[in-house]
Amino acid sequence: AFSGGKVIGGPQASGILCGRQDLVMAAALQHLDFDIFWDMWQPPEMLIDKGRMRGVPQHGIGRPCKVGKEEIVGVLTALQLFIEEGDDARHARWKSHLDIIANALSDIKDIEITRLGYESASNVPNLDIKLNYSSANAAKIINALQSGTIPVHVDPMYRDQNRIGINPICLIQEYLPIVIQSIRDAITTQRR
C-alpha cells in the first residue's frame, strides 16, 4: 500500500494498493456493496477470481471507507505526473529547494546546516539545522513554527539534540520565502 498523498502528491484521502492478487482481491471484496445476482456479476478477472467465491459478496467492512471518483482521478493524475517527472528531476528539484533555504539561513550565527541524502536520487535529501547557541531549544522553535500565523512543519526527530530537520517533499517554490522567514524569525526570537 502506498499513500496517494505525500511523495506522489495526490489527494490525502487516497492510496494505491498493489501486489499479490489474493491480497488485493481480499481488500477489494471488503469494499463492495452488491444488490446483484451471481450470474450478472462480472468482476475484472485480473482483480477478482470469481471461481474462488461461493456467491456475491455482501456489504464489505470497508464499504463506508470508499474513495470518491475525485480522489481516484486525483491519485491517478498525480501518479502520472510523478512518473513523468522522474526520480532524477524530482531529486534535483528537492535539492534546489533545500539549497535556497540553506543559503538564506547561512548568515545566522551559531547554527550549522548539513545537507543529507544529496548523493543519490534514491534518497530524499534533507537539511539538518543544528542550533549551537546557549539558549537553543529546538522543541520550542518547532512548536513556534507549527503555531505560527502560517504553520511551518519541520522534522522534530532530533529535537533533543537541538537539531531541526527540513524535508522537501511538500515544499513548493513560491512558499520558500515564507518557510525561510518563519525559521529565521523563530531562531531570532529565541536568541533574544
Task: State the predicted function of each range.
Residues 27, 42-44, 171-172, 183-185:
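Short, charged/polar low-complexity linear motifs in solvent-exposed/disordered segments
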